């Protein structure tokens, strides 16, 4: 089923008459469809030792958790979770009528060239930017409650 959803999301006509081009970023766990100023992320239906997106419900929960967690640091990017639906005649739509067949994270895109990796590649990562970023990360983590039952360093060793 995901193959037909990926085909649908890869088609500019799926987003309306004004969309001419879609860029697609594929990772080991997701497909991200860049559409104008929007981005839609589809979690791959898979199960790995460290995550489980194998069912529709697993993917819905993962999308909701991603939005909830990432809105804390990027509320201007994370819009929400949208269903991919299939009408009785089999037509797919984003947030349309019919049965929900998958879930998407809807995001506002940020400007091209603003990835930290691109700053590094272009030798534009200044000391002040790195220090500001480190301070933001420190402040963020300082304000979070510790997860005392998560397994600590032993759990991290199992992941890494």
Labelled PLM ranges:
Residues 2-160:
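Conserved ATP-binding subdomain of kinase catalytic cores across diverse folds
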């Amino acid at each position: 089923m995901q193959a037909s959803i990926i085909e649908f999301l890869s088609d500019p006509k799926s987003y309306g008459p004004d969309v001419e081009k879609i860029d697609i970023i594929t990772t080991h766990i997701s497909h991200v469809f860049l559409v104008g100023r929007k981005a839609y992320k589809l979690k791959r239906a898979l199960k790995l030792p460290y995550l489980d997106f194998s069912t529709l419900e697993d993917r819905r929960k993962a999308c909701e958790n991603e939005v909830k967690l990432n809105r804390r640091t990027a509320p201007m990017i994370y819009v929400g979770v949208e269903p991919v639906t299939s009408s009785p005649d089999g037509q797919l739509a984003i947030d349309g009528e019919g049965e929900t067949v998958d879930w998407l994270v809807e995001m506002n895109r940020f400007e091209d060239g603003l990835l930290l990796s691109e700053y590094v590649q272009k030798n534009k990562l200044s000391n002040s930017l790195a220090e500001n970023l480190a301070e933001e990360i420190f402040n963020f983590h300082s304000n979070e409650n510790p997860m005392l039952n998560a397994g600590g360093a032993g759990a991290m060793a199992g992941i890494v």
